[in-house]
């Protein structure tokens, strides 16, 4: 009997062990989503390896982590908390994506979902470029999200420091540069970097100190338009990029930017696509709105007006994604602007180089003149003025703007009364 009970006990114990052993493990909860994409050459469609990718939180404009690089298949992948993000990509021999003066497009990453964001890049026009690397520190603390600019006589090349403070500036022409870091609340020491072609200039480490205390304030005057609240920012004069942390929205048509580092800036109002632009005649009369800060408070007012609406080719107002055109001779179209005597069109590349139209230095004269009865013109139309500086090139990104001019008794016999938005008219030639 004892043997039977013993066998029953062993059988029950074995059954319990079997049940416990077969119990499924609790699934690990999913806490992130995946951002993934393939980076390719925009012309050949071939995969690009070793592309530096920095992911930014769209709400704070700060990097989310260390830099990542694309693999030999051009693929990059990052695990992220659910939220809104944007990316910037750079590689030696290729232009940055997006270009420095174009705002990136944000997107959402959802829990447990793979978000695909492919990137196309075109070859750099810099033929003798090297690259600069370094780290940005404030004492023993890495400084993330600082704008790093290498400047030589007004020619600037830039990048953003990642979460570990590391940075790389690609495609820097051979020369000697002054390298600084820019971030609200911090002042930077300057380092020198001598660049040679196809070579890394390493160790350009930058020390920053907290305590930047300058302020820039001002009021917005609205001309020929109703009052709305607009964005105001301080940008780097060499690259046109907004200094991280130095942008705001007006309140009752007044703005204030605090914690401004010492240095010179180009102030900018109403850069967003909101139907409002800085008054071009105000800029001609007063000059570009530069401000030099060395602690203290600087007053910088602005005048703004209604913008001219561009039609085609152009990105939509809600996006800065350039549209693709299938010709190197596109026709530009816009809506008429009241009280205009004539229009001036201006076509620039992604780096701000004038390709066609625009004005001579300091708006002294117009390179093209389009009669007020016309609201379209083909690229390079010789009947309206000077020929293009160069032809449009397949695979490159361009921006076109149109100015409204009015005849009057002012010096030169005319003044500008409006212009199209900074972030409209973006297109890529197929």
Segments from the language model and where they lie:
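Sec-dependent bacterial lipoprotein signal peptides
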Residues: 1-20
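Long luminal/extracellular ectodomains of secretory-pathway precursor proteins
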Residues: 20-430
